[in-house]
């Protein structure tokens, strides 16, 4: 499989940094949450790809609903706008991530917009179901979904599981297994290890991770660092945190 064909596999909507998958939580009403990946290095069969930046914007529309917009800028070697999309995310059942008992359940869906890459000028669609809960001492987020890709309207299926382990007051070790497959393509599966650190009491989180491909269609290695921050456009508020 060539590096170009790897790009046809979809990148998930509204991912929760530094993961490919996401959690069953949304921004509070009138709160803007910014997920910025300011450096990403991907190595596939001795070819390096730099992505800087990647940007996800989450805006709380009203209680338990948010709008999500995202895109990436890729240099390999030309500059391209990749993986643009607009999505709606809704919490169907309040639970751990909303400060209530039980699991949190959410759904996210929306169009995959055209990119500047060759062959990706169409419009696709993606929908994901999300469940978040606790398997002590871990917080776990499970995702599954699918859709139609933007390149040639082929169906795809995606899945992922995130685990988070608090090791200090403002530090979490994190891991993820995730994958995806598209009709006529090999599975793209990978594993992640990293950390999320909150350096102050403000709503700012720094992250770093390394990802290793565990199937032939996945990139060999990926390294990234990024930051997530949020602020209210009305009054200050914070997302419930389960630790």
Where on the chain are the PLM-derived regions?
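Bacterial N-terminal signal peptides that target proteins for export
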Residues: 1-2
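N-terminal signal peptide c-region/cleavage motif recognized by signal peptidases
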Residues: 8-10
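Transmembrane beta-barrel domains of Gram-negative outer membranes and organellar outer membranes
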Residues: 13-243
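Short stretches within intrinsically disordered, low-complexity N-terminal or propeptide regions
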Residues: 5-6, 92
